[in-house]
Amino acid sequence: MNTSNAVRAEILTQAVPYIKEYTGKYVVAKYGGNAMTDPQLKKSVMQDILLLQLVGVKIILVHGGGPEISAMLKKLSIESHFENGLRVTDDDTMEVVQMVLAGKVNKSLAADLSALGGRAVGLCGIDGGLIKVHQKNEKLGHVGEIDEINTKILDDLLDGGFIPVISSIGIDDDGNPYNINADTAAAKIAAALHAESMVVMSNINGVLRDKDDENSLISQMSLADAEELKKSGIIADGMIPKVDCCTNAVKEGVKKVFIINGEIPHAILIELLTDEGLGTMFTK
């Protein structure tokens, strides 16, 4: 056996205990950032999702699409406004959000999985009342706070051998659509399912002890660690809501949550199925 074949065999052998750990368990992957726009990275993410399903993982893909929404709004001469990182979503903006997220982005991802031989079903939180919400703040317009996840729809799809691909749009009791932060949607879905893991793909490697030093990655963090790092200012600015989303998921019953760099090919498989790992893991 040549060296490269030996390495391949070692990688496959290394994956066995992790596959055993995850088989039959729920894993929620939140997809966003540059990994959504680069064709090769996109293909590697879809391959990872499909492989996880093939080895028996109940995998669910949740996606955002902020850059695509902003680009379409610009084309339509509709100005984008943000408050504390949340898109102010008036009636016109909400129409564009639905068109881009539930239409273009969602169906494109479902088609990509299908092209690789997967059986994907693209849906948004409106479908079947999957994500029930109420208005977060009148000033923000159609921005929703999640009340409930209808897990039966997801279980029915997963039991039928399908991969749910979910865009982060919710619905209230009066049938009004709402824009939802995709990280939050993924965390609430993972918590409702008591998922084994949630993986958040981002444009960063994880939580850094020194934001200017890529080698200062914190590979594992407890809930108490996260609070201490926030107090000390190591977790600051835009990392605070992302970390809060991860720690809230753990508090609500998700066993492990990872922030990984989606710009690394096959980052999901490396994080979940090898000894190496890539990003920051949050646990109780």
Identify what each model region corresponds to.
Residues 1-263, 270-272, 276, 283-284:
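Nucleotide/pyrophosphate-binding catalytic subdomain
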